[in-house]
Amino acid sequence: MSGTSATAAVPFLAHSDAFRRRRFLNWFPLGVTYALLYMGRYNLTVAKNSLGELMTKEDFGIIFGAGTFVYAFAFLLNGPLVDRMGGRKGMLAGAAGSAVANLAMGAYLYHVVSSGEATSAPLRLVFSVLYALNMYFQSFGAVSIVKVNAHWFHVSERGGFSGIFGTMISSGIFLAFTVNELLLKAAQRVWPGAPGPSVAWVVFAIPAVMLALFFFVELSLLRDRPGQAGHADFDTGD
């Protein structure tokens, strides 16, 4: 009796192959985009190591602290906002906003270093504002993922899927630290003899380009519900 009840409590979901393919095209780019948000979040740490005295520990603490404060506060605003506008628009806003903020940080850094006036430039102030803006848009990521996937996965499917998706998201740490470090080394090979500060802009520009690329990927593929992608909506068991 108990076995029968347990079986009945978790219905078998006979998703078609077409549905599973379309669902993959929904969640996989979503996971990649979120990983790229990590790349455009912790790149500040990699840049700090390259900038040396242009970004002291005190500067970094203030800049990162401003971003962390905004990130925490933004959840209070963006959680209800994503509930209203949907996870698709939330993730698009996050990717676009973070791309613009990272591009601005990279462009500003390139400008002040190449001008030869980096030591007198208000780098701490400008980066505090731009990084806080970046972190505001970064806060759209997690809530948007939860909102979107809730409509595509039955509660009985989410356990196994969360492990796969969690691994994808963890790859963002690899992108943030390992790949950004490799980008710095590659830039120094492209411009031999260039000091670290003169190529640090790369770790902001490349994540910006990648986020912009995946903004358009998500614009094309990401949908809030199966019903918006040519498949029937279903009871997810929530």
List the model feature ranges, each with a label.
Residues 25-55:
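Extracytoplasmic
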Residues 65-80:
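Central cavity-lining transmembrane alpha-helices of secondary-active solute carriers
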Residues 96-120:
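C-terminal ends and interior cores of transmembrane alpha-helices
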Residues 101, 116-140:
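Hydrophobic core of transmembrane alpha-helices in multi-pass small-molecule transporters
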Residues 130-167:
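Cytoplasmic helix-loop-helix junction between adjacent transmembrane helices
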Residues 165-222:
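Helix-loop-helix hairpin linking two adjacent transmembrane segments in secondary transporters
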Residues 222-238:
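Flexible cytoplasmic inter-helical loops of multi-pass small-molecule transporters
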